[in-house]
């Protein structure tokens, strides 16, 4: 058997890469003698906001894969002759790997494996051959190890993205393709990536994404620090610890229509279970049905939704309470717009309107609606890094004005792929929250003075996540997150610090 070998210099020419990494205390107007109840029974409030997201990507018809088109000096050798020339094997293997020549790699791998091979090149060749032979799980596993070791090796990242697409790992595939777009690529390669994204967007398969977090809470009820005292009054709440699990499941399906339009259904389930403090257990469901338009650079989605929330009761519940009760119901509409300004810059905008109704009579003064607007600008200078800045506005209108407020915030973030397979993500945030009215009338005798003025809060947050890219088990990568929240206020009973540690296991099916 004769083999035509391309003789090229022993250099790696990167042309790709990137992974888009992509509470308020509710207080009562109570006027007890010296103990002022601090109502922390409501679960954490969440605010619609965009942040770097890893979008779902998959493919239908397969775009043409990149292969070598260069004309080089060629020689004809038999397998036996090639086996006696390790230098030629290496000079042939490297271009074959870089240029996605799966047939050439398949021929060269058995020869190279017997010649004191470089472990990295051997693993890369094994990944290519596994993909050619349809062993996609094995191929993806090997490619992830390769990228963890050399995150700037763009040809291998492209091959990983294609393997993920073929393996119908939609979210992961789209994330890798979006990373690759951030590089200064030749026009044909950008066209190739866009063709993959376009065909992936036309997939109509069900997507399931879920995960479990281990929670370690030192102040699950957002209470002021122990020993807080003001004007002779003390809060009724003290920080409580809790340990447990949070869980989430997202089920979604798209139906592609003509000219880039689509309809979409999704269902979200979220919950928290604390085995040593059950009164803070919670559970929620949200159903979304809508549609939109998308192409390789733009996605616009309008999604009406309904939501139900169950809660044991928090501080309003007895110590041994365990039963979840209907807490609130909501309905509204969400508009989500993503647009790539350039291959390196992306802007994401989310607008949401919600009508919320509380089930328990004593909570119905909180009935009302809310508006939120969130904008995030994302910059990806290369395949190993991203930066983002976000601006958020949230307005809550309630029957009782003392519960209504406006919140304005800013977020800054940075994600990085480091050598040795380590990845990190850091986000810092700052927000101001201003309530519409005081929680106590000025002529109320048994209330502290700070209840008689409009409450203003300053809210600070830090989130840091770290994981190892090559640590995978059944497609799951464990991640560790530390989250810190601090609120200062002109109401000392609304000030608190909160440290949380998460251990996250998530997977896309």
From Swiss-Prot:
TPR repeats mapped onto the chain: 120-153
InterPro entries: Slam_C_b-barrel, TPR-like_helical_dom_sf
Residue ranges with Polar residues bias: 46-57
Region annotation (C-terminal probable beta barrel) ranges: 205-509
Membrane-crossing segments per the record: 206-216, 245-256, 261-270, 284-294, 298-308, 331-341, 345-355, 371-381, 386-395, 408-417, 423-432, 461-470, 476-485, 499-509
Annotated segments matching region Disordered: 43-72
Entry note about domains: Consists of a soluble N-terminal domain and C-terminal probable beta-barrel in the outer membrane with 14 predicted beta-strands.
Reported function: Required for correct export to the cell surface of some cell outer membrane lipoproteins (tested with PM1514) upon heterologous expression in E.coli and probably also in Pasteurella.
Protein name in UniProt: Surface lipoprotein assembly modifier
